[in-house]
Amino acid sequence: MRRGWLLFLFLLLAVACGRDDVILHGETTMADIRDGVLVTDNGLTYHIAEDRTSSEWKSWQRTFVTCDILRQRSDKAFDIRLTEAHSVLRKEPVPEGAVPDETLGDDPVQITAGWVSGGYLNLMLRVVYRPEDEPHLINLVRLPDEDGTVRFRLRHNSHGDYYGAPGVEPPLSFGLSYVSFPVPADLPAADGLAGVPVEIRYRWHLTDGNGNLLPETEEKSLTGRIPR
């Protein structure tokens, strides 16, 4: 019996010694980068205690990260283990007519997700790309408001690197990217607690019956509300 208790105690000690002392695993968040510290969209401050990425995140303005929360420093400050970091393009929306059409482009781009946080309109985008080509340009053009709805058009200049362009044929390579646009300060009055209606128009490919992309494109839109 004593031997059994000793074995049980040994197992408890082994589990305790091997336990990863982490408050939360796999936290994901958008954050601004300020002097090597992450300031998340919900107002928390993350200090990087361990960096397990090979990214150059310190040179970025904004990032989408996956991390483990290790320790709490204060009410809203934590030490974290950084496990994954993606660069997020931070860019101001441009007024309609402020940038020439040939610079903006109108090539296909897909909005796969969109949400508002941290004072930003955040978009996850998908484009067809070839790694050897020059970087694509993304802009969010502010259109005139219509019936209380804030209207935008997402513009994409691929410099000829899109499906349907000469030399761009299947199999295709796709790139996912994150872009954050500061929410404009001159929004119309909100409709009660529901927020301000918003519409983002963009152009993306048609698909066949099996879900495969076709070279032809169509107008699409993402709608939602911006909290006030």
Please place each PLM-identified region on the residue numbering:
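Surface-exposed beta-loop interaction hotspot
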Residues: R73-V128
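Short, solvent-exposed, Trp/other aromatic-anchored flexible loops in extracytoplasmic proteins
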Residues: H159-H205
